[in-house]
Amino acid sequence: MARISCDLRFLLIPAAFMFIYIQMRLFQTQSQYADRLSSAIESENHCTSQMRGLIDEVSIKQSRIVALEDMKNRQDEELVQLKDLIQTFEKKGIAKLTQGGQMPVAAVVVMACSRADYLERTVKSVLTYQTPVASKYPLFISQDGSDQAVKSKSLSYNQLTYMQHLDFEPVVTERPGELTAYYKIARHYKWALDQLFYKHKFSRVIILEDDMEIAPDFFDYFEAAASLMDRDKTIMAASSWNDNGQKQFVHDPYALYRSDFFPGLGWMLKRSTWDELSPKWPKAYWDDWLRLKENHKGRQFIRPEVCRTYNFGEHGSSLGQFFSQYLEPIKLNDVTVDWKAKDLGYLTEGNYTKYFSGLVRQARPIQGSDLVLKAQNIKDDVRIRYKDQVEFERIAGEFGIFEEWKDGVPRTAYKGVVVFRIQTTRRVFLVGPDSVMQLGIRNS
């Protein structure tokens, strides 16, 4: 019996150890669960705290949004009031400029943005010759944007009407790396021309830029051009600019030409033409767009031999490109031409081809190498044939005139013929492969 009792005690010892081990494991497990539970509670508290912080932040931002919306609404109301005020001043200005019942020949608008010093120089030049004929040519400044120096300078003149184009729509370029300035310029042009043609009801508009000076006969020239455009619907616009108007390539201040290439840089168009262009006006590069055949549709442009505008803007959207070679040497006309006494009938479509073909026909043909030297050694006008754009660019480069083409048309060309002077009086005609046929010249 005693042996059995002893055996039981020995059996109880492992059982006790097993019980103690189990209790320890249970305690350890409970401790782990307790730690995890504590960590979970702590995480929950942290998340709750963060959520409350976010809710507070959202609430603050919502309050700011509401405040900003209120501010925007107030600014919109102020903008409406300012627009009404501007319209009132503009109406008063237009009434003053057109008083006496005389219908203007054309409104003149200077397109400006952020160059107050350039603008001052331009307006000074324009007012010098516009003041005596102000009733015929009401003057406007159209500013794109809110540059305060330009605005203050514009408002300092009581001889003109100020317009401001404020466009807050973001510019999205069609190709990477493009300058947004060209898109903004196109928007500004459309807005300004819409204002002048449709709001102010002008029948013609002359467009200048804020880096131009004008010639003494600038306004008389455009008055004569206006009459010519009324007679001939094949003239899309009249320009005061010649791309090859550098001092060494011009001579005759009385000479005018038709061109298939839109010159720009001081030009006039009619409301009927704008009616056609405004609905499809491009997003950017408006001047090159006007040079596309699909847009000018066979119509042509009047240009002078000697420029009536001078572009002094070395720093602008084109970043001074070609300024020293092509713009700085431009000859600004300094001769007062009595355009009222000039018969411009030769420029109408029915007469000009015959007139111009006569000039080309009389010119002496030259070919081969050393064309510049040959042209200089001949006392008469000369003509040089080119077979394609590559050959034209080579010949133009030798003489130093513009080599550029747009949509198959060289700058200044009429029916593929580019004309310029060499050694003052003599003309050089660069004649395209189809020009002789288009001009009706035989046996040349």
Swiss-Prot record:
Residues 1-6 are cytoplasmic. Glycans are attached at N351. The chain crosses the membrane at residues 7-24. Mn(2+) binds at D211. It catalyses: N(4)-(alpha-D-Man-(1->3)-[alpha-D-Man-(1->3)-[alpha-D-Man-(1->6)]-alpha-D-Man-(1->6)]-beta-D-Man-(1->4)-beta-D-GlcNAc-(1->4)-beta-D-GlcNAc)-L-asparaginyl-[protein] (N-glucan mannose isomer 5A1,2) + UDP-N-acetyl-alpha-D-glucosamine = N(4)-{beta-D-GlcNAc-(1->2)-alpha-D-Man-(1->3)-[alpha-D-Man-(1->3)-[alpha-D-Man-(1->6)]-alpha-D-Man-(1->6)]-beta-D-Man-(1->4)-beta-D-GlcNAc-(1->4)-beta-D-GlcNAc}-L-asparaginyl-[protein] + UDP + H(+). Residues 25-444 are lumenal. Belongs to the glycosyltransferase 13 family. This is Alpha-1,3-mannosyl-glycoprotein 2-beta-N-acetylglucosaminyltransferase. The gene is GNTI.
